């Protein structure tokens, strides 16, 4: 078991949603998903524009909610960056804000801090959805059908191309 798996296991507490793209909050009947990306791990500033960085963060969260049957409604955005990269951080934030607004998602909060490298985190919360309509990987069974509408594997290919 690698360190990432150990950290995840540390917080599992028999939670049936760990490992799925989203968690279903039965009290509010909403899906929630969060992802983070960091400079020099998920993107290289020499190879990615502010728009591409924002797009990567947005799409990873947006697709998690949609693939689980939900429609994003609210967003929380966190960004950490060094002062010398503040113009780039602002550009990434503006691009992300435009994607969020275009999809009629309301930004309800977040945080900004300083750090050595750029760190971005986005959390999306869906509109209300009935539990019976939620699609979770943990509920998949042998012989379930999977439909792909676009090419897959480009995220990994892009990552391998960076280093």
Question: What does each of the following model-derived ranges do?
Answer:
Residues 1-163:
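Helix-biased detector of long, well-ordered alpha-helical tracts
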């Amino acid at each position: 078991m690698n360190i990432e798996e150990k950290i995840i296991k540390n917080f599992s507490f028999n939670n049936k949603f760990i490992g799925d793209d989203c968690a279903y909050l039965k009290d509010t009947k909403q899906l929630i998903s969060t992802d983070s990306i960091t400079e020099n791990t998920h993107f290289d500033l020499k190879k990615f524009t502010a728009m591409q960085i924002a797009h990567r963060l947005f799409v990873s969260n947006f697709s998690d909610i949609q693939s689980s049957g939900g429609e994003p409604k609210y967003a929380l955005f966190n960004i950490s960056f060094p002062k010398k990269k503040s113009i780039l951080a602002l550009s990434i934030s503006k691009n992300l804000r435009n994607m969020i607004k275009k999809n009629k998602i309301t930004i309800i909060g977040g945080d900004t801090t300083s750090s050595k490298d750029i760190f971005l985190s986005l959390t999306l919360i869906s509109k209300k959805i009935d539990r019976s309509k939620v699609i979770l990987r943990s509920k998949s069974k042998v012989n379930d059908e999977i439909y792909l509408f676009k090419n897959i594997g480009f995220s990994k290919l892009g990552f391998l191309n960076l280093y």
